[in-house]
């Protein structure tokens, strides 16, 4: 009788590499890039606002409906700039521009988490963009 140990060992090894891939800095950069909108970032910095990038955990149904629903939830929060929410269902990430004088980033994360909990989703801040230097363009055009 065959034992499933070699398959189990292989599955465990594969899952270890998968976990490390999700936790790597490059993957975070990919998630941020998927929801980065330069026009939103420029406008936010000009208004002394910030841009928050969130990882979204949970089962997000694919499609435009999910994207629009999450964007609407994000934009309904106090302090979030209207029209600034960007969602990537494929990369499970979200960005919003917000006024830190009206809502600190940590409170924004809590409020967003509460609103998305009903959909079985949680969020975690990946990065906050708050300095014009982060938008510096280098090289010749």
Model-based region annotation:
Residues 1-12:
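Bacterial N-terminal signal peptides that target proteins for export
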Residues 68-77, 107-116:
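Short amphipathic alpha-helices in soluble, non-transmembrane regions
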Residues 18-20:
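N-terminal signal peptide c-region/cleavage motif recognized by signal peptidases
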Residues 22-31:
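Cleaved targeting-peptide boundary
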Residues 43-60:
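Short glycine-/aliphatic-rich beta-strand segments at the starts of folded cytosolic domains
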Residues 89-98:
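Surface-exposed aromatic
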Residues 98-105:
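Helix N-cap motif at beta-to-alpha junctions
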Residues 99, 131-141:
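Short, low-order "capping/linker" segments at domain edges
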